[in-house]
A protein has these predicted regions:
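N-terminal active-site segment of His-dependent metallophosphoesterases
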Residues: 1-66
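Extended active-site neighborhood of metal-dependent phosphoesterases/phosphodiesterases
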Residues: 2, 61-169, 195-198, 210, ...
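Short aromatic-enriched loop/helix-cap "lid" or pocket-rim segments at secondary-structure transitions
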Residues: 23-25, 92-98, 102-103, 182-187, ...
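His/acidic metal-ligating clusters that form di-metal
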Residues: 37-48, 135-137, 146-241, 277, ...
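Active-site glycine-centered loops adjacent to acidic/histidine catalytic or metal-binding residues
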Residues: 15, 53-54, 85-86, 175, ...
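A short C-terminal boundary segment appended to hydrolase-like catalytic domains
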Residues: 1-5, 222, 267-306
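Active-site-proximal beta-strand elements of phosphoester/diester hydrolases
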Residues: 7-20, 133-143, 171-173, 240-247, ...
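Feature marks short, surface-exposed loop/turn motifs that line or immediately flank catalytic pockets
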Residues: 17-20, 88-90, 178-180
């Protein structure tokens, strides 16, 4: 019988955005900051590393970037498990564009082709496994009810994990947070400039409701997310603790909540027989490099010339 240690650790990193100098845009400081995070993680010596998406700067338009992202993750020397993010496979699906002129929201939609490219180049998802007495699962939640083949696969996965034997804890890895301001929040309007960022960052009400129902049936105790590049203190609702993760690349959305903090870093979780305890680790060094280039956000094709 395998002896389960009384205390052990895993880390959650997200939105690391490893870029390439061959691209039309590149921020070398972000890559440097990942190197800093990697050294800090090695010093902690966790048993697992969960990677919550956006491992490449532009995997959705330049999938060759995934190769380097995989190399730097392997170099940490900690077993890792990954799900995609929107910069890897595309944004949540919309049939309407916003009023923003710097992007085409419909053209940014996640597609089955991009999801399959991620599976081919990085790894399969969704997934679920037991480590010690904890079940870990990961899925790309934003495709729920999207009508894609991978969304149908997600439905099967959610039904299957709901039938598995219960575990002491069950950690679910997501990219998008399931909610922005409240678990019962209404639909945000993509065409309202005041609501656009909340629409962009969150999950719409109906898929959110179905995801939470499935998570509850599966005995999920913790949901880890990224995407917003801003952490908040863990929020527990109806037995599920929601953990909003920080980015190692760039801060954003830090002024949206009174308790929001967009300090760059990553999350460590210490597992004991009684609890999973959270600790934030800010980067010990943040790059001051100014030699990057290219536009931010989701530039239209004509803005992607190097």
């Amino acid at each position: 019988m395998i002896q389960v240690p009384d205390t052990w650790k895993f880390v959650h990193v997200t939105d690391i955005h490893i870029g390439s100098p061959e691209s039309y845009r590149f921020q070398p400081g972000w890559n440097n900051q990942w190197s800093t995070a990697a050294k800090q993680i090695q010093a902690i010596a966790p048993e697992l590393m969960l990677v919550g998406g956006d491992l490449a700067r532009d995997g959705n338009t330049e999938p060759q970037q995934f190769e380097h992202s995989i190399q730097v993750l392997n170099a940490v020397g900690v077993p890792w498990h990954v799900i995609p993010g929107n910069m890897d496979t595309g944004n949540k699906i919309t049939d309407r564009s916003s009023l923003r002129t710097d992007r085409d929201d419909i053209a940014c939609n996640v597609t089955e082709e991009l999801l399959q490219t991620f599976k081919d180049k990085v790894g399969a998802f969704p997934w679920s496994f037991i480590h010690h007495d904890v079940r870990f699962s990961g899925c790309y939640e934003i495709i729920k009810d999207a009508g894609l083949p991978s969304a149908i696969e997600l439905d099967r996965f959610l039904a299957e994990i709901g039938q598995l034997p219960p575990s002491h804890f069950h950690v679910m890895l997501n990219h998008y947070p399931l909610f922005i301001d409240g678990i019962n929040e209404d639909q945000y309007d993509i065409t309202d400039p005041e609501e656009y960022m909340s629409w962009y960052f969150g999950v719409d009400p109906e898929p959110r409701k179905r995801l939470i129902e499935a998570y509850q049936k599966a005995g999920v105790t913790h949901v880890l997310s990224g995407h917003i590049h801003c952490r908040r203190p863990p929020i527990t609702i109806d037995g599920i603790t929601f953990c909003f993760g920080a980015s190692t690349a760039m801060p954003q959305f830090g002024d949206h909540w009174p308790d929001g903090d967009d300090t760059l870093g990553f999350q460590t979780f210490t597992v004991t027989p009684e609890a999973i305890d959270f600790e934030f680790h800010p980067l010990t060094e943040v790059s001051t490099r100014t030699d990057g280039w290219g536009p931010g956000g989701h530039p239209k094709p004509e803005a992607r010339a190097k």
